[in-house]
């Protein structure tokens, strides 16, 4: 009798396990491979708008993404004057449809940030040399993130600065996405030509913050916790 009861209990346990594993709702979700499925569309056109804040004069470029990189309709450099401030806006399109809103969504804002690295000669790839490159940039120009909410309106049109509402520790601090921002040129600079590598980093982790919870600096892009959604190089001329 005990053997029959033991067999019956074993049968019930096995039946329960099989039934539980067969429920679709209880099956573990298969995580997305974000190197392939980014969770947003990939743009095929970019509009770059540089505005001199002292004159409101604009210099606009349109870039088309090709297998060989971004090809611009205008190869002339953005010109910055010593002591000047320049608002820089990046607008992404898919077949002429604006998609910036996808990068500031509840899911995408925490894991997207633009980085701006200005350099002369060849871009430095080693970590130590890139740190020196960033210091050299800081001696010439600095950048301040100034993304807006909603993203398709300006501050003068009633938009507000976009905040890190997703950051439970600092929900009232600025969200560094980089679709909009301001470059401030130092006053004691010489007339020189530069290149600026702009990359939109897609972070492969919970969010784009450093492990200590601090924001990453605009010209210090990490190399192992992200993939670039976009990378483009722009000519910059600074005039004394």
Task: Explain the meaning of each model-derived region.
Residues 87-92, 164, 169-218:
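Internal, hydrophobic beta-strand segments that form the core of beta-sheet-rich folds
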Residues 76-95:
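Beta-strand cores of secreted/periplasmic/IMS beta-sandwich domains, seen most often
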Residues 211-240:
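Short beta-strand elements
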Residues 104-125:
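Short edge-strand/loop segments of extracellular domains
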Residues 129-181:
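Extended, solvent-exposed segments with strong compositional bias
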Residues 16-44:
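Bacterial Sec-dependent N-terminal signal peptides
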Residues 1-19:
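Sec-dependent bacterial lipoprotein signal peptides
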Residues 54-81:
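N-terminal edge beta-strand
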